Amino acid sequence: MENKWFLSMVRDDFKGGKINLEKAQKLLEKLDIQCNTIHVKCIFKDNDRLKQGRITIEEFRTIYRIIAHREEIIEIFNAYPENRKILFERNLIDFLTQEQYSLDINRSIVYEIIQKYEPIEEVKQAHQMSFEGFTRDMGSSECLLFNNECGSVYQDMTHPLSDYFISSSHNTYLISDQIMGPSNLWGYVSALVKGCRCLEIDCWDGSQNEPVVYHGYTLTSKLLFKTVIQAIHKYAFITSDYPVVLSLENHCSLSQQEVMADNLQSVFGDALLSDVLDDCPDRLPSPEALKFKILVRNKKIGTLKETHERKGFDKHGQVQECEEEEEAEQEEEENEVRDSEILDILQDDLEKEELKRGVGIKFFKKKKVKIATALSDLVIYTKVEKFRSFHYSRLYQQFNETNSIGETQARKLSKLRASEFILHTRKFITRIYPKATRADSSNFNPQEFWNIGCQMVALNFQTPGLPMDLQNGKFLENGNSGYILKPHFLRDGKSIFNPNKAPINSNPITLTIRLISGIQLPPSYHSSSNKADTLVIIEIFGVPNDQMKQQTRVIKKNAFSPRWNETFTFIIQVPELALIRFVVENQGLITGNEFLGQYTLPVLCMNKGYRRVPLFSKMGESLEPASLFIYVWYIR
């Protein structure tokens, strides 16, 4: 039956005799078989017996079977048909419930699967599935590792903003380094398309009274502020309906601040939040309440009540001024941290505050800040406030005030004062940004700050690598909306949680992964054919006690279909914060291993059963059909 179907599908293509590589590739596409061009070329060459660059129908059949009829899939299929040839509906139901742990499977669902994936018409009409249909089903999105339920907005979006992790970028306008790299609108467009919800805009005075965006005091190129926000307006809600926060680094004169305010209002119109919501005058609203809204994050002078009372009045020429303790220049950050070590000897925050004022240690410098009223009044729920101490915040910080903390200081606080840090992030939105010495736009590991509930962990989206893999993997959850509801123990004021200590009343999971095989993995960059010495590393990222990794053996000279059949077990204490990362490498003897591909996702967003792990490049691009084939099981 399958032979008859195959010949009916390809016979016409061989009427003129043999076919070349290009036609063979098109014929594989016609048969719904995804192929990596390099692998197809090598397999074609190996099966072209006369080495003329053209193959017969029998040679093509061999190529098709090599690519489409994988041994590990044949073994699974053969365990279920009563005659080892055809799956009846009841056989498919057994497979889906026993192996794939699919809930609520019935004949109607099975019928839909057969209709979708079975290519042989007479088998389809009989409500049955051949191996051809089974292998297409196993290679489909239905069998991906990522749970489709996590791929939609499934979380409660009515909590206050502070209850969510918010996808955030740093120096969004840059697409390279921070010294000479170009500023580009693509930085904003790309971040928004990826679901980023907090964008950074460095604003400086430009010529002809037009503010510009660039990395100040460097050779990076400049963009007009108005052009930037026009691009943001166009792409803000393509991927997600939930609010976008514009984090302004404002270095503009008063006159150009007014231009910024005018631009924001004219470009965004009603989408720009310029007053408190009626039901949230004294508390943070929810992402749901702020759908399709743009929020401005900047310094603000005066109260929300005063802002409300000025609404509708012309504010041009009006200036607000205050004296505030401003953070020292970025290059002084390390000195500040060393000075703060003296204060860590004291246990009481109030004593530290008094010491700062009474002892000659200069932590902050006083500065008069002037802000155009027109711009200040556009800041509603995301006012920037200098972080002084947890004690100060508990006493004086207002619900609409947010903090920015550099990675060095934040890391120190997260290690020494984790419980207090969590208490802080339960109430106040906290943004963590890379230290100034990262001139190459490198990133820190964001996991340590998610562990303590920091909402806006800002990364350089333009820089690929492990941190961005974790970022992209984490925000796959909840429909790539850019907002993920924090676990209850990071929201609940009564919960006692410290990521650096053994969790109390945790609900750990035991995760078992059988890494079966690789499918058309990217060949080594150094290979002249389609070969690689492949290995897979499985890593867990989460609280410190959950950080672990395990590795397969190396399969020599096989990137097309390596078989490992190795089983790994992980006990994860805090799965709510855990990410799992699969990394495929080519073993290197001298210069270290070569990265071939990776995939990262939240542990609790994994499907059980036989699953396909899609692989992505270092730049985050899909490497389809390259993937891993695994079996997943976990219990709590």
UniProtKB/Swiss-Prot annotation:
From start to end residue, where is composition biased (Acidic residues)?
321-336
**Cross-referenced PANTHER family:** 1-PHOSPHATIDYLINOSITOL 4,5-BISPHOSPHATE PHOSPHODIESTERASE ZETA-1 (PTHR10336:SF29), PHOSPHOINOSITIDE-SPECIFIC PHOSPHOLIPASE C FAMILY PROTEIN (PTHR10336)
Reported function: The production of the second messenger molecules diacylglycerol (DAG) and inositol 1,4,5-trisphosphate (IP3) is mediated by activated phosphatidylinositol-specific phospholipase C enzymes. In vitro, hydrolyzes PtdIns(4,5)P2 in a Ca(2+)-dependent manner. Triggers intracellular Ca(2+) oscillations in oocytes solely during M phase and is involved in inducing oocyte activation and initiating embryonic development up to the blastocyst stage.
Could you list this entry's UniProt keywords, alphabetically sorted: Calcium, Coiled coil, Cytoplasm, Developmental protein, Fertilization, Hydrolase, Lipid degradation, Lipid metabolism, Nucleus, Transducer
Q: Where is the active site?
A: 170, 215
Cofactor names from the entry are: Ca(2+)
Q: What class of enzyme is it?
A: hydrolase
**Every PI-PLC X-box domain range:** 155-299
Looking at the record, the residues that make up the C2 domain are 491-617
Q: Per UniProt, what is one GO molecular function of this protein? A: phosphatidylinositol-4,5-bisphosphate phospholipase C activity
**UniProt note on tissues of expression:** Expressed specifically in testis.
User: Which E.C. number(s) belong to this protein?
Assistant: 3.1.4.11
Localization (cell): Nucleus; Cytoplasm, Perinuclear region
UniProt comment concerning the protein's domains = The EF-hand and C2 domains are essential for triggering Ca(2+) oscillating activity and the regulation of PLCZ1 enzyme activity.
State the organism of origin: Sus scrofa
- How does it associate, per the subunit comment? Interacts via its C2 domain with PtdIns(3)P and, to a lesser extent, PtdIns(5)P in vitro.
**InterPro entries attached to this UniProt entry:** C2_dom (IPR000008), C2_domain_sf (IPR035892), EF-hand-dom_pair (IPR011992), PI-PLC_fam (IPR001192), PLC-like_Pdiesterase_TIM-brl (IPR017946), PLC_EF-hand-like (IPR015359), PLipase_C_PInositol-sp_X_dom (IPR000909), PLipase_C_Pinositol-sp_Y (IPR001711)
Can you say what this protein is called? 1-phosphatidylinositol 4,5-bisphosphate phosphodiesterase zeta-1
Q: Which Pfam families match?
A: C2, EF-hand_like, PI-PLC-X, PI-PLC-Y
